[in-house]
Amino acid sequence: MSDLLHKLNFKIADASPEYKQRRKIQMIRFFTASAVTIFASRFAYRATVSRQYIPTLFQGNHSPPLSYNFTTDAAVAVGTGTLLCGSVTGMTVFGLCWILDVSNIKEFGWRMKSMLGGWESEKKLSEAPMDEESSYIQDSLNDILDGKYDFENDTEEVAGELKTN
């Protein structure tokens, strides 16, 4: 197989076995979600066709028969709609993960951040000058974390002032 890939000049021929296994798992997830979507759509189609009301020759088509149950019909419609929505969403997500070579949520965040220019924006923001109020707050927090303030004495002084008032 590798010889054929080298002959056809595919870059994946030089990839590591771990990378090939990772891509294979992504592909299997996508095709599994696609198969579930196909089965769900067939199920929804059959559920719709079986509930279809076809009047007889001299029956009006504006009034359904008396034995018709609207509650069951609504429940089946909600169930099949949810099933279709979930399966199509899964197929879309796994397809995008396969295309973008993403295996988990953290990788997806990194990939989106790099694609949307987040690294450059973060670098520009870190190089921007800090205003006076923000630097004062940052210095105060750093002093608190370094232990430059003694809060035990401050609370005793405040308690003494409250007793005198």
Swiss-Prot record:
Gene Ontology CC: membrane; mitochondrion
Recorded superkingdom: Eukaryota
Location (main, coarse): membrane
Membrane topology: Multi-pass membrane protein
Transmembrane regions listed in the UniProt entry: 27-49, 78-100
Location(s), subcellular: Membrane
Keyword annotations from UniProtKB, A to Z: Membrane, Transmembrane, Transmembrane helix
Annotated InterPro entries: AIM11
Entry's family note: Belongs to the AIM11 family.
Identification of the protein by name: Altered inheritance of mitochondria protein 11
Originating species: Candida albicans (strain WO-1)
